[in-house]
C-alpha cells in the first residue's frame, strides 16, 4: 500500500490496523524530507541554540549541549523516556503507531533523515511488534514513554514481542531482545543524529492509534446493536411507527435519520409486525380475538387486546439515542483521521525559509476530546441495550412470560443474565467519565497542562467488550422472546439474525448454563456477523461516511 503523507484515508488506516499490508512511502515525499533534514544539520553545526537539537529537553531546555554530544543527547533521550509500565500494547496498535509516525515524519517538517522513515517501515513490513507498555503517557508533550519504547526497539536496545518460534506475534508471545530480532530480519538498527530521537517520541501517534483501534473495534458492535435492537422491537411486539421517516426529517439529525432508516429496513416484511397491526384495537373498539390455529398460551395474551399506545423509550427512542451516538463516532473519526495525517512533532522545521518553530502540536487534546465522545457513545449504546433487556424480562411491559421462562418460578430464565448486563452497563458509566477534564502538571511545571488522551483512548477497549456482552445477552433474550411468538415470523433480515444465533445456541425451554451462550453470542457481535446481516439490506445509508467506510 502506498503511504501518502498527509493524505491517508481511514479505510487505509483500517487496512494497516488489520495487518498483512506492506507499506511503501510515496516517493514524492523524499524532497521535503531531505530539505528539512538539511535545515537540522545546519542548525546542529551552527552556534544558535535550537530546542531539541543542541539543548536539553522540557524544563532543561535552557541547557546548551556541545556539538560532540548531540548524537548521545538523542540516545539518552530515548533511554531515559522508556519508563512505561503495564501490559504491552496490542499488535494492531503498534502497526498504526509505526505507520502514522512514518507518515508524519515524511511530511518533511521534522528534520529527520530518510533512513529513519525507512526503518519504521521495515519494522512494520516485517510484521515486528515492539514491546511497548500501555501506561505512562499523559498525552503531552506527545506520547513520550510509549513512543520511546517503540523507538528503543528500532535502535536494537529494546524488545519485540514474538512467538516462541521467532515469528512475529499478534499482540501475544514472548519478549525477545530487539538486536537479535532485527538481525534475524536483516534490519539495520537505527543510529540517531540531531533531533531524530525527539522527532520519534514527540507526537500523538500512540493515543491516536489507541483511539483508532477502538473506533475500528466498535464499528461491528454498533452494527450489531442495530440488528439486535430491531429484533427486540419485534420480540416485544413494539410499534414501528416511531421509525417513520417524517418524524426524523423534522429534527434533521443525520445519525438519527440514518438509524431510523436501518430500523425500517430491518423490520420490513415481519409477520409479527403485520399481526400486531391487525390485533391492535382501534379507538372505541373492543378486544379482537386472536387468530385461529397454532396460538400458544402466551401468544393469546399478546395478541388479544394489545392496547398499548406508546412503547417504552428503550424501543421508541432508539434512533434518537443510537443515532446521536453514531454522530459522535462520525465526529471522532474525522478528528482521528486528521490527527493521523498531522505533524505533531516539536519543534517544526520549515525548509522554505530555514525556520525552526517551537509550538504545541504534540498536545493531544483533540484526541482526548474525541475519545471522551466515543466513551459516552459506547456507554450509551450499552445503557439502552440493558434497558431493552430489562423490558423484555418484565412481563408487565413486554407481555412475554416472566424472565422469558415458560415455567417461571421453577425456572429463573434471564433474571440473572440481566443482572450481568446491569453490572456491565454500570461499569461503563464509570469509565465514561471524561479523561480530558483531568490534568496534572509535569516536568517541574514546564508542561503544566496535559490532555490525558492516551488513557482516554486506552479505556475504550474494555468498554467495548462490556457492550458486546450486553448485546449478546439482549440477543439471547430477544431470540427467546421470538420463540414465544411462533408460528409468527419476524422479517427476513431478523430471522437471519435469529437463525445465526441458533446455529450455536438453542432455545431455552428450561434453565441451563447461560455463560457459554453469552460468550458465543459476544464473539459473533465482535466479529461482524450481524453487520453482514445489515449490509445485505438494499438501500441502506452508509453509516461510516465520515470514516470513508461504507456498509
Task: Please give the residue ranges for each predicted region.
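C-terminal auxiliary extensions adjacent to catalytic cores
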Residues: 1-21, 25-32, 36-44, 70, ...
Amino acid at each position: 500500500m502506498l503511504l501518502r503523507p498527509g493524505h491517508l484515508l481511514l479505510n487505509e488506516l483500517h487496512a494497516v490496523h488489520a495487518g498483512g499490508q506492506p507499506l511503501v512511502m510515496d516517493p514524492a515525499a523524499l524532497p521535503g524530507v531531505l530539505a528539512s533534514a538539511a535545515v537540522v544539520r545546519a542548525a546542529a553545526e551552527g552556534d544558535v541554540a535550537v530546542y531539541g537539537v543542541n539543548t536539553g529537553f522540557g524544563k532543561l531546555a535552557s541547557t546548551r549541549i556541545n556539538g560532540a554530544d548531540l548524537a548521545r543527547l538523542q540516545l539518552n533521550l530515548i533511554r531515559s523516556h522508556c519508563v512505561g509500565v503495564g501490559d504491552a500494547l496490542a499488535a494492531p496498535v503498534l502497526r498504526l503507531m509505526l505507520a502514522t509516525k512514518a507518515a508524519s515524519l515524511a511530511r518533511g517538517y521534522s528534520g529527520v533523515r530518510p533512513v529513519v522513515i525507512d526503518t519504521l517501515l521495515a519494522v512494520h513490513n516485517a510484521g515486528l511488534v515492539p514491546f511497548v507498555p500501555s501506561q505512562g503517557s499523559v498525552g503531552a508533550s506527545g506520547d513520550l514513554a510509549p513512543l520511546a519504547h517503540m523507538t528503543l526497539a528500532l535502535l536494537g536496545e529494546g524488545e519485540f514481542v514474538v512467538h516462541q518460534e521467532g515469528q512475529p506475534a499478534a499482540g501475544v508471545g514472548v519478549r525477545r531482545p530487539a538486536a537479535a530480532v532485527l538481525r534475524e530480519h536483516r534490519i539495520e538498527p537505527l543510529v540517531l543524529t540531531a533531533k531524530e530521537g525527539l522527532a520519534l517520541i514527540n507526537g500523538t501517534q500512540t493515543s491516536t492509534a489507541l483511539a483508532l483501534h477502538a473506533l475500528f473495534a466498535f464499528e461491528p458492535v454498533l452494527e450489531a446493536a442495530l440488528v439486535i435492537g430491531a429484533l427486540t422491537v419485534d420480540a416485544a411486539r413494539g410499534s414501528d411507527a416511531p421509525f417513520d421517516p417524517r418524524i426524523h426529517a423534522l429534527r434533521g439529525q443525520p445519525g438519527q435519520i440514518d438509524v431510523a432508516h436501518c430500523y425500517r429496513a430491518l423490520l420490513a416484511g415481519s409477520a409479527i409486525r403485520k399481526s400486531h397491526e391487525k390485533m391492535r384495537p382501534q379507538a372505541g373498539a373492543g378486544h379482537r380475538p386472536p387468530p385461529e390455529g397454532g396460538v400458544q398460551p402466551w401468544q393469546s395474551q399478546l395478541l388479544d387486546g394489545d392496547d398499548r399506545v406508546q412503547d417504552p423509550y428503550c424501543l421508541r427512542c432508539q434512533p434518537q439515542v443510537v443515532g446521536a451516538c453514531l454522530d459522535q463516532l462520525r465526529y471522532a473519526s474525522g478528528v482521528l483521521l486528521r490527527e493521523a495525517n498531522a505533524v505533531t512533532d516539536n519543534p517544526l522545521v520549515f525548509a522554505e525559509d530555514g525556520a525552526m518553530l517551537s509550538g504545541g502540536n504534540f498536545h493531544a487534546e483533540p484526541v482526548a476530546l474525541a475519545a471522551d465522545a466515543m466513551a459516552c457513545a459506547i456507554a450509551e449504546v450499552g445503557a439502552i441495550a440493558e434497558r431493552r433487556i430489562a423490558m423484555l424480562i418484565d412481563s408487565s411491559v413486554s407481555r412475554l412470560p416472566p424472565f422469558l421462562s415458560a415455567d417461571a418460578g421453577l425456572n429463573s430464565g434471564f433474571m440473572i443474565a440481566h443482572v450481568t448486563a446491569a453490572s456491565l452497563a454500570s461499569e461503563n458509566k464509570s469509565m465514561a467519565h471524561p479523561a480530558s477534564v483531568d490534568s496534572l502538571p509535569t516536568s517541574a511545571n514546564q508542561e503544566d497542562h496535559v490532555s490525558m488522551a492516551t488513557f482516554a483512548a486506552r479505556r475504550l477497549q474494555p468498554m467495548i467488550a462490556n457492550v458486546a456482552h450486553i448485546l449478546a445477552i439482549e440477543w439471547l433474550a430477544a431470540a427467546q422472546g421470538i420463540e414465544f411468538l411462533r408460528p409468527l415470523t419476524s422479517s427476513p433480515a431478523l430471522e437471519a439474525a435469529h437463525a445465526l444465533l441458533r446455529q450455536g445456541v438453542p432455545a431455552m425451554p428450561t434453565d441451563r448454563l447461560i455463560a457459554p451462550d453469552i460468550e458465543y453470542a459476544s464473539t459473533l457481535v465482535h466479529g461482524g456477523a450481524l453487520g453482514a446481516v445489515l449490509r445485505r439490506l438494499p438501500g441502506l445509508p452508509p453509516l461510516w461516511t465520515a470514516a470513508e467506510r461504507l456498509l
